[in-house]
């Protein structure tokens, strides 16, 4: 059964260091023909914590589908684990909790996971060796590529403007924070009625 959503939110996310992030934007639209509208950030510029608080506070107003443009989990099938060789949980929700406990970074940041705690899994430049050795994709991304959808980014690539690594691991901290209020698909069942968080990252 598909939930009957009456409102839709798209969140342009950021993994940048710091407390507030000009790269974050939140758009909202209702069913019907009206154009989406931008949601003003508290204080003029969004923080990741602001987004989490906003989602939690608005999710109960009306059934809303919240979409985030980051990867909800690293590849698992391709490598037999999220961070093979390291002792980490083997399912999404427990892994999000692990990331949140591990990272002392400001405003739900997660750069320390990539740069220190699990550094060997991430490509930061030529000193790390052959980049192709880090280019692991999730099963859905491999299918997307095989179908001609284009080359997906991987959370293990931590260099360049197009990298999604820092944003994705920061996003996992948000998922851990909001999961008690709003289910997160496909890790949680679809609600019969109510709000839901999904990934819209490709």
Q: What does each model-identified segment do?
A:
Residues 2-9, 13-202:
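RNase H-like (RuvC/DEDD) metal-dependent nuclease/polynucleotide-processing core
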């Amino acid at each position: 059964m598909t939930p009957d959503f009456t409102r839709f939110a798209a969140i342009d996310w950021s993994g940048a260091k710091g407390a507030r992030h000009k790269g974050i934007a939140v758009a909202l639209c209702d069913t019907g023909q009206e154009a989406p509208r931008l949601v003003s950030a508290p204080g003029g510029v969004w923080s990741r914590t602001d987004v989490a608080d906003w989602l939690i506070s608005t999710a109960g107003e009306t059934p809303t589908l919240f979409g985030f443009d980051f990867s909800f989990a690293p590849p698992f099938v391709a490598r037999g684990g999220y961070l093979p060789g390291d002792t980490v949980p083997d399912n999404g929700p427990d892994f999000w909790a692990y990331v949140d406990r591990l990272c002392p970074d400001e405003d739900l940041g997660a750069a320390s996971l990539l740069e220190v705690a699990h550094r060997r899994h991430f490509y930061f430049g030529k000193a790390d060796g052959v980049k192709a050795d880090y280019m692991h994709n999730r099963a859905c991304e491999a299918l997307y590529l095989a179908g001609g959808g284009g080359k997906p980014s991987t959370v293990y690539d931590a260099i360049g403007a197009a990298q999604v690594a820092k944003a994705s691991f920061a996003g996992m901290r948000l998922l851990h924070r909001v999961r008690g209020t709003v289910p997160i698909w496909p890790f949680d069942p679809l609600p019969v009625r109510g709000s839901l968080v999904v990934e819209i990252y490709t």
